[in-house]
């Protein structure tokens, strides 16, 4: 199946180091798990504005490995989900080897270089976006296949957005998600409308596959972050705008508990992945090969 190669989805790519005040991060504690090869995550956006990226997980288990996935609000009527992997080295580049017919891909540059995929995805406020990524050894030898899936709530099925095959270059870290830094972030990548409220909650589970996924319950953060609705949250915007959003959702979510620089919050509840989700993740669809 041929895949259309098009221009980038307009995301401003972040490294794990915060580059501007337009981004806030959660820094997850993997609880000693250094070799996770699967991650399941949930993102729920409660207030948004065009030009905002909500990264579910940005992983960097060690040099030179790294990648990220999440959802983005591009334009007033356009949203998407994004999955990308950085180059192993200047000579070893990831390649898309399988993808859904609606997936678009290209090379990216700027803050590092690598392989990028995205798919238009009309996610809604207050609706939880679910994603799953898994790493497996590739048949091609010293490579790792990284598969990314998103749950389509209307059709009630998982979609295989893409598989990106990454050269290991002799580095064990390429095969894992954990073992180094793992972050979620919220970024106003246009730098515009800074007083407009943006709010999202996040949860992550890691393991070696669907049946071994364990919740991550501890996180620190920077910017405006804390706990809300038994999840971690990130927020950006003017004080009055954010206050109005917190009040709007208080009946459903409760009141936020704010973190701060160097401040530790109690762990969130160690909720297991729903049994129906675990079952579905054991029988995922396969997208067509990219020629």
Where do the PLM segments sit?
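Short, aromatic/His-centered strand-loop micro-motif at the edge of beta-sheets
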Residues: 106-130
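Secretory/extracellular carbohydrate-interaction modules
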Residues: 23-105, 118, 255, 259-264, ...
């Amino acid at each position: 199946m041929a895949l259309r190669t098009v221009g980038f989805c307009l995301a401003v790519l972040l490294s794990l180091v915060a580059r501007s005040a337009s981004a806030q991060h959660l820094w997850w504690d993997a609880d000693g798990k250094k070799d996770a090869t699967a991650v399941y995550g949930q993102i729920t956006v409660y207030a948004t504005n065009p030009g905002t990226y909500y990264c579910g997980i940005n992983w960097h288990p060690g040099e030179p490995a790294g990648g990220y996935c999440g959802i983005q609000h591009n334009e007033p009527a356009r949203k998407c989900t994004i999955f990308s992997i950085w180059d192993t080295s200047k000579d070893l580049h990831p390649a898309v080897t399988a993808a859904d017919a609606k997936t678009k891909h290209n090379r990216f540059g700027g803050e590092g270089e690598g392989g990028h995929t995205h798919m238009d995805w009309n996610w809604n406020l207050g609706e939880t976006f679910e994603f799953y990524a898994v790493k497996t050894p590739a048949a091609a030898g010293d490579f790792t296949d990284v598969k990314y899936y998103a749950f389509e709530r209307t059709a009630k099925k998982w979609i295989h957005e893409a598989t990106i095959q990454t050269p290991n270059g002799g580095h064990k870290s390429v095969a894992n998600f954990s073992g180094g830094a793992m972050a979620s972030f919220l970024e106003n990548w246009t730098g515009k409308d800074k007083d407009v409220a943006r709010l999202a909650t996040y949860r992550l589970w890691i393991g070696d596959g669907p049946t071994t996924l364990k919740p991550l319950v501890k996180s620190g953060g920077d910017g405006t972050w804390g706990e809300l609705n038994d999840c971690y949250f990130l927020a950006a915007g003017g004080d009055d705008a954010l206050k109005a959003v917190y009040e709007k959702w208080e009946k459903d979510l409760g009141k936020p508990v704010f973190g701060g620089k160097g401040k530790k919050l109690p762990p969130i509840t160690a909720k297991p992945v729903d049994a129906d989700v675990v079952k579905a993740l054991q029988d995922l669809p396969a997208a067509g090969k990219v020629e």
